Amino acid sequence: MGSLTLVLVAVDAPMARAWRTLTEGRTGLVVHEGSITDVDTDAVVSPANSFGLMGGGIDAVYARWFPGISDRVRAGSGGELPVGEAVIVPTGVERPAWLVSAPTMRSPGERLPPDGAAARAAARAVLRLWRDGTLPDGVRVRDAVHTIALPGLGTGVGGLAPDVCAGQVGAAWDEVLGEA
């Protein structure tokens, strides 16, 4: 299996601290402080809603960066992608070539429960897609995607605390790739 570098993106100090704690004792995780648009990566993660509507938070950034991406996400998911599942679609630009949609909420604007279960489900879906999924041309995702930039999952619109998000992403990493 190929190796994955997961770039944990923090736009503020609390998220950066939480991500740094997560990287302790784990290889393959690096922290980037700043905009996700500055990360040189193969794929970015959209912690969108199940309907692929991309009008708020990081998804609004993606909608401006990758024209038509919301339509591609909806087409790739059949119109609704449940929390805990992920789909990978082309961005239409050279880098990052791919966007992974992994919803943290069903409907736009939902506040997430404080336990962070949705962040864990989304992170697990991203990592399983990388480990087991295929691109539209049949190439295994893990053979084509070596870096994925991950923003806080549910920490913006969803209102999840950064430390809870980081803990849940770490649990998903250990569960899915801990033996990789």
Language model feature labels by segment:
Residues 1-180:
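Macrodomain-like recognition of ADP-ribose-binding/processing modules
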